[in-house]
Amino acid sequence: MLNAFVFLNCDIGTEPAILNEITDISGVSEAVQLSGVYDIVAKVSEQSREDIAKSVRKIRTIANIKSSLTMIVSEEEQQQHSAKQIEERVVQ
């Protein structure tokens, strides 16, 4: 499973409606509203980079999104994190 974080800038006041739309997109595992440089961040979890790209394209078609920045978590980091989670479960 690959993960990416999509940071969004939205038109003022449209954040709640955009959050509702984003959470309906398959592949979006969570999304929250932020204060600061970005208005919303969504976590996308998919099996491949191509599937992540499809989900990001769907997000970017939502009305009132002004810009987006997508950061894909490195595969090495995800593998290390997954191995650590498994190890923690075994120890417990």
Predicted regions: what they are:
Residues 1-92:
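A compositional/biophysical signature of low hydrophobicity enriched in polar/charged and small residues
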